Amino acid sequence: MSEHPGIVFLAGPTGRRASLASGPDVWEVVRAIKSARTSEPDLTEEDVLALVENNTGVPARMLRIAIRYWASYPDEINSEIAAAQVAEDAAEHAWQRERDLLAG
């Protein structure tokens, strides 16, 4: 994508989604950054990027590419983050119901 070098689009069960050309989906990166910022509110911008880089293996320059894409399309990426959270919550609830049934 010429407007956002380093971003590609992938098709999947949830539709077309923005992804780093050599890494995870943009929504996954943004969620990791938001999580790091929430968990470590006193970190500097560079420290947040270093934390996410160390935890994900995604280089800081690629994290910045994802951030730039999010800055242009925040509603799209935030919607994908919300949809992922709903799916994860549903899976966790189903797992818990299964555990409850088996526990008697």
Predicted regions and their residues:
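Long, charge-rich, low-complexity intrinsically disordered regions
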Residues: 2-21, 35-37, 50, 54-55, ...
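Short, amphipathic alpha-helical "recognition" segments used to contact nucleic acids or chromatin
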Residues: 23-46
